[in-house]
């Protein structure tokens, strides 16, 4: 079911072997679409921004966020500020990368794209104040 929801987009390079009667039939590349609830700071109004990244097998949500950080361009092709979030161990132990993924709180390091409905919606944990984007202030846990 999850594989059927992966979006396919044409590759950017033309292949002469795929042209049929003057039409450019480009092979399709699978992509992962993410809709991220963003917020510039704790006082600003939240907004949503969409991103599409190339699909890779066994990709987790945190790897998607790292790809967006490497290339911060939204699905409209506009350059944007990199998304911020917390992470630490990347081994499903610490919980620092926890966020709301498709309406459910879970760790982004263990959330595998193939097992998620697309588009994947990411939001900050609602029980903590937002610092920026998916990054929240957990300091009250340690008081």
For the regions a protein language model found, what residue spans apply to each?
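Signature of N-terminal electron-transfer/Fe-S-associated modules in redox systems
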Residues: 2-143
């Amino acid at each position: 079911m999850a594989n059927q929801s992966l979006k396919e987009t044409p590759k950017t390079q033309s292949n002469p072997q795929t042209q049929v009667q003057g039409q450019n039939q480009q092979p399709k590349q699978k992509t992962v679409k993410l809709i991220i609830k963003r917020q510039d700071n704790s006082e600003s109004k939240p907004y949503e921004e969409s991103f599409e990244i190339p699909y890779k097998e066994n990709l987790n949500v945190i790897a998607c966020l790292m790809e967006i950080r490497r290339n911060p361009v939204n699905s409209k092709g506009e350059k944007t500020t990199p998304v911020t979030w917390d992470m630490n161990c990347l081994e499903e132990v610490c919980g620092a990368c926890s966020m709301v993924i498709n309406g459910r709180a879970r760790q982004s390091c263990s959330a595998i794209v193939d097992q998620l409905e697309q588009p994947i919606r990411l939001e900050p944990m609602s029980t903590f104040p937002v610092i920026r984007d998916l990054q929240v202030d957990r300091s009250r846990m340690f008081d």
